[in-house]
């Protein structure tokens, strides 16, 4: 089934099937990827840290492996429920500041993406997992400096106004 996956082909047939060694590999990869992503978020003092990312990824990986073990069912119900649960959990990291600015949106999306990567690891799609993980790390670690550089070179600027009452708008 996953023999088209280059990493699974390198590892061998045991990594595709659900056995003790493939379960250990999938859990280990899931924890390591999530720990690195969580470390990056925690180092910037964001709402969700390393443990949160590890737990979300681990739950997703286990949910997908459970779905794969119930091969007779037509729909992956446990992993679908995991996606919904992760969306609910990640939405709790979004806050509105006193200046009506949204805080935590990137962390929320990163948490959800980490859960999706956990699902791909649980499915045994190692190449997809590595590519998704690399893209997520690039977005979280490299793009902020690129974004700041673009803003500094831009001729546009932001103005924030606070008014005491509506009559001041006239």
Question: What are these language model-derived features?
Answer:
Residues 55-65, 86-89, 108-121, 166:
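Small-residue-rich segments of transmembrane alpha-helices in multi-pass membrane proteins
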Residues 100, 124-170:
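Canonical alpha-helical transmembrane segment with a positive-inside/aromatic-interface signature
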Residues 43-46, 70-75, 97-101, 122-127:
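Membrane-interface helix caps and helix-loop-helix hairpins in membrane proteins
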Residues 34, 38, 64-68, 92, ...:
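Structural signal for membrane-spanning alpha-helices in multi-pass inner-membrane proteins
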Residues 33-46, 89-102, 145:
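C-terminal ends of transmembrane helices
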Residues 1-78:
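Alpha-helical transmembrane segments and their membrane-interface boundaries
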Residues 77-89:
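Ligand-binding beta-strand-loop-alpha-helix segment within the catalytic cores
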Residues 12-14, 18, 22-23, 27, ...:
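Hydrophobic alpha-helical transmembrane segments of small proteolipidic membrane proteins, enriched
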């Amino acid at each position: 089934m996953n023999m088209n996956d280059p990493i699974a082909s390198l590892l061998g047939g045991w990594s595709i099937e659900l056995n003790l060694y493939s379960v250990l590999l999938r859990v280990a990869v899931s924890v390591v990827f999530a720990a690195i992503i969580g470390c990056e978020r925690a180092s910037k003092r964001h709402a969700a840290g390393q443990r949160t990312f590890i737990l979300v990824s681990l739950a997703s990986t286990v949910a997908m492996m459970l779905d794969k073990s119930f091969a007779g069912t037509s729909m992956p119900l446990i992993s679908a429920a995991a996606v919904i649960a992760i969306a609910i959990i990640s939405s709790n990291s979004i806050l509105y500041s006193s200046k009506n600015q949204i805080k935590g949106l990137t962390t929320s999306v990163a948490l959800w993406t980490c859960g999706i990567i956990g699902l791909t690891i649980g499915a045994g799609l190692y190449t997809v997992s590595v590519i998704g993980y690399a893209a997520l790390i690039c977005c979280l670690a490299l793009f902020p400096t690129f974004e700041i550089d673009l803003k500094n070179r831009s001729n546009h600027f932001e103005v924030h106004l606070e008014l005491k009452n509506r009559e001041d708008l006239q």
